[in-house]
């Protein structure tokens, strides 16, 4: 995954620096969406020195703009994008009980949302679709 992220970033004219690689690795180590603060703590721990939160925020903003990570808006958290070389809109299933977040790729559903917005005279720049409920495991309990 890191190689695809590096290729996507470099294809956009940006450099894959050691700090950017560390931020990506830290974010990839989380099983659930991680906040910028959590990523900062993980990078600081891995490097054995305090990394400035502002640096991590800037890198996460760059990664979001370049499709390397996606942001779960309601959680103000980030996930590594498994397909950084292919831009697509995401649908997130967010469990209100345990916090797990599943990423779905359903271009037809998102295109339908875009079409409905266009019919209403609205130009969508970046759709953010999140469905909140309970995951399969939490439903079983």
Language-model features: locations:
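Short alpha-helical segments that sit at the start of domains
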Residues: 1-24
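Basic amphipathic alpha-helical segments that dock to polyanions
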Residues: 56-66
């Amino acid at each position: 995954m890191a190689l695809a992220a590096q290729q996507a970033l470099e294809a956009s004219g940006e450099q894959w620096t050691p700090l950017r690689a560390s931020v990506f690795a830290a974010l990839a180590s989380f099983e659930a969406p991680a906040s910028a603060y959590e990523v900062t703590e993980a990078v600081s721990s891995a490097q054995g020195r305090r990394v400035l939160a502002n640096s991590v925020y800037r890198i996460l903003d760059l990664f979001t703009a370049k499709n390397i990570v996606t942001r779960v808006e309601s959680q103000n958290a980030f996930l590594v994008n498994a397909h950084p070389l292919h831009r697509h809109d995401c649908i997130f299933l967010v469990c209100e009980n345990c916090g797990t977040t599943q990423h779905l790729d359903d271009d037809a559903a998102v295109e339908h949302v875009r079409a409905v917005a266009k019919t209403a005279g609205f130009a969508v720049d970046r759709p953010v679709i999140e469905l909140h409920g309970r995951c399969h495991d939490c439903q079983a309990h």
